[in-house]
C-alpha cells in the first residue's frame, strides 16, 4: 500500500495549495475565536495579572529571544503573568511583521533580529548585541533554534563583558554548547562522567562507514547477535535527518542498496556523521532549567522523531527520577558558571531495577516541553532566582497539577483528519484509520490544550495560521523549494 507521502496531495505544489486553502477556509472560524477571546480575555483569570514586588527591588528588563516558537512564547507569558518586570522579545523574521510572538500581549516591545546571511552569523550576533545594549537588558533568556545555539553562546560571553556583572543570561557559553550539541563530542563527554552511552563512531567518509558495518556483520554472524546502527548527521541536515532511522547494516542481499544509501548522504570531513548503535526501547525527552550548575526545574515526556504531542511522565516514576539524576550530574559537573536550558533525548531499555537509560542527543537550549510548565507560577520565580541565589528554592520545580497534554490544532487537523480522509478517498487508506484518528483528534480538542492558543493572548495563534504559515507556503511555491514536513511548534520547515 502506498504511504500518504507518495499520494498526489503530498506532492510539492498540491500540498502547498491545499494548506493555503485550509488557512483560507478556516479563517472565519479563527476570527470568531479571536473575537470571543478579545471580549473575554481582559476578564480572564489567565490574563496578565502581574505579581507585585514586595521587596522594593527595581523593575528589571528581561529579554526573551525565540518567541516565534512555542517555547519562547510560553516563557514570556509565564513572566508576564507572574512577575511585574519589563518583558521584551526579539526574533528573526522571514518577512517583516510575520513573527507570531510579535503580537503577544505578554511583551512590551518586539525587536526584529537580522538573520544569518549565507551561513554568516555576524549580522544576527550584531543585531542581538545591539538590542541587549540599547534596552539595557538585566536578564536574557535565550530560546535558540538548532541553528542559532552556538551563536547565542558567543553573544552571551560578549554581553557579559560589555554589560558587566549585573547582566544575567539563561544561556550556556559556546564551549559548553559545542560540547553538548555535537553528537560525537557529547558521547565522549558523557562517557568521561562514568555514564553509559551507546556505541558510537564519528564517520567522515562512506568507506569508513562501510568498514564498520562490514566488521559488525562478521561479529553478528560469529556471536549470533544482531547489532544494528543508525546514521545521524552531526550538524544540521534536514534531508539526512528524515532518513536517520534507517537501520544498518542492511541484509546481505541488499549490499548494493547499502552502498547506494550511504552515497546519497554526502558524508565528508566537512559534513561528518555519527554511526550510533541502535538501542531497542522507548524514546523520551527532557527539559530542564539550570542556574549556576543546579537544576531548578525539570520535566520529562515520551518522545518521537518529530514530537507534536506532549504529556509529562509522573514525577515519582523510576524513569523520570533516573533522567533527572542524569541531568543533575551533568549540571553539577559543569559547576557554577553553567546556566541555561538543558534537554536530553534518551532511549530506555528494560524496566524496574534493570532499567538503563542511554543518552542519544543533547539540546543545550530550551525544549518545546517547557509548554508543560504553562500553568506553573513557580517557574517564573525560578528564572528570577539567578539574581538572588540565596533566595532560590532547593526543591526541583515540576509542572503544576493537574497536568495537561498539549497539542497543536493545525498539526492535528492535517495529520489526524485531512491526510487519513484524503488517503481513503484516493483508495489508499482504511476507514478504520479515519475513525481512529478522528477519535484521537476529539480527545485532544476536549481534554488537552493547544500549545499556542491562550484566551487572554490569542493573536499569536491567529498570526501563526493565517500569516506566518501562508507566507512560508507561498515562499515555497515561488522559490520551488520543496519540504518534507513542518513543525508547527517551532515554525520549522524541513527541506527535502
Task: For every predicted segment, state its role.
Residues 26, 50, 381-496:
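Peripheral (often C-terminal) accessory segments that flank ATP-dependent C-N-forming ligase machineries
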Residues 288, 332-372:
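Conserved metal-phosphate-binding beta-hairpin within the catalytic cores
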Residues 190-191, 198-200, 214-244, 267-281, ...:
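ATP-grasp fold ATP-binding core
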Residues 164-167, 174-199, 203-205, 211-217:
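Glycine-/Pro-rich loop/turn segments that contact NAD(P) or position catalytic residues
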Residues 274, 337-343, 396-401:
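Flexible, glycine/charged-enriched surface loops at secondary-structure junctions
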Amino acid at each position: 500500500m502506498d504511504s500518504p507521502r507518495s499520494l498526489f496531495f503530498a506532492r510539492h505544489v498540491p500540498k502547498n495549495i491545499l494548506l493555503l486553502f485550509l488557512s483560507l477556509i478556516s479563517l472565519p472560524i479563527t476570527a470568531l475565536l479571536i473575537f470571543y477571546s478579545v471580549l473575554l480575555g481582559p476578564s480572564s483569570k489567565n490574563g496578565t495579572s502581574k505579581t507585585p514586588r514586595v521587596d522594593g527591588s527595581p523593575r528589571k528588563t528581561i529579554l526573551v529571544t525565540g518567541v516565534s516558537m512555542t517555547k519562547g512564547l510560553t516563557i514570556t507569558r509565564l513572566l508576564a503573568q507572574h512577575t511585574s518586570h519589563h518583558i521584551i522579545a526579539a526574533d528573526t523574521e522571514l518577512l517583516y511583521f510575520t513573527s507570531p510572538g510579535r503580537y503577544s500581549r505578554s511583551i512590551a516591545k518586539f525587536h526584529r533580529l537580522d538573520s544569518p546571511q549565507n551561513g554568516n552569523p555576524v549580522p544576527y550576533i550584531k543585531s542581538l548585541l545591539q538590542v541587549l545594549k540599547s534596552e539595557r537588558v538585566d536578564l536574557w533568556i535565550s530560546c535558540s533554534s538548532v541553528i542559532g545555539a552556538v551563536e547565542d553562546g558567543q553573544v552571551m560571553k560578549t554581553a557579559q563583558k560589555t554589560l558587566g556583572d549585573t547582566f544575567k543570561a539563561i544561556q550556556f557559553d559556546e564551549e559548553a554548547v559545542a560540547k553538548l550539541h555535537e553528537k560525537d563530542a557529547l558521547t565522549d563527554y558523557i562517557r568521561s562522567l562514568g555514564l553509559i552511552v551507546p556505541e558510537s563512531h564519528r564517520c567522515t567518509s562512506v568507506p569508513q562507514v562501510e568498514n564498520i558495518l562490514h566488521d559488525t556483520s562478521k561479529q553478528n554472524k560469529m556471536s549470533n547477535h544482531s547489532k544494528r546502527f543508525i546514521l545521524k548527521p552531526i550538524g544540521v541536515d534536514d534531508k539526512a535527518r528524515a532518513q536517520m532511522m534507517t537501520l544498518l547494516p542492511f541484509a546481505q542481499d541488499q549490499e548494493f542498496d547499502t552502498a547506494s544509501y550511504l552515497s546519497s548522504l554526502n558524508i565528508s570531513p566537512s559534513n561528518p556523521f555519527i554511526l550510533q548503535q541502535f538501542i531497542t526501547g522507548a524514546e523520551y525527552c527532557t527539559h530542564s532549567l539550570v542556574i549556576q550548575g543546579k537544576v531548578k526545574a525539570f520535566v520529562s515526556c515520551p518522545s518521537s522523531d518529530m514530537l507534536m504531542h506532549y504529556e509529562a511522565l509522573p514525577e515519582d516514576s523510576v524513569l523520570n527520577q533516573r533522567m533527572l539524576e542524569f541531568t543533575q550530574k551533568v549540571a553539577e559537573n559543569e559547576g557554577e558558571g553553567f546556566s541555561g536550558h538543558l534537554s536530553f533525548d534518551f532511549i530506555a531499555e528494560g524496566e524496574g531495577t534493570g532499567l538503563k537509560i542511554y543518552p542519544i542527543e543533547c539540546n543545550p537550549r530550551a525544549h518545546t516541553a517547557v509548554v508543560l510548565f504553562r500553568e506553573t507560577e513557580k517557574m517564573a520565580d525560578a528564572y528570577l532566582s539567578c539574581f538572588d541565589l540565596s533566595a532560590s528554592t532547593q526543591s526541583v520545580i515540576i509542572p503544576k497539577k493537574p497536568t495537561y497534554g498539549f497539542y497543536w490544532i493545525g498539526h492535528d487537523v492535517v495529520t489526524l483528519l485531512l491526510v487519513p480522509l484524503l488517503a481513503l478517498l484516493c483508495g489508499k487508506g482504511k476507514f478504520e484509520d479515519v475513525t481512529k484518528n478522528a477519535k484521537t483528534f476529539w480527545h485532544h480538542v476536549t481534554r488537552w490544550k493547544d500549545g499556542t492558543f491562550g484566551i487572554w493572548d490569542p493573536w499569536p495563534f491567529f498570526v501563526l495560521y493565517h500569516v506566518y504559515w501562508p507566507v512560508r507556503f507561498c515562499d515555497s511555491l515561488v522559490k520551488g523549494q520543496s519540504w518534507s514536513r513542518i513543525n508547527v511548534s517551532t515554525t520549522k520547515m524541513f527541506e527535502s
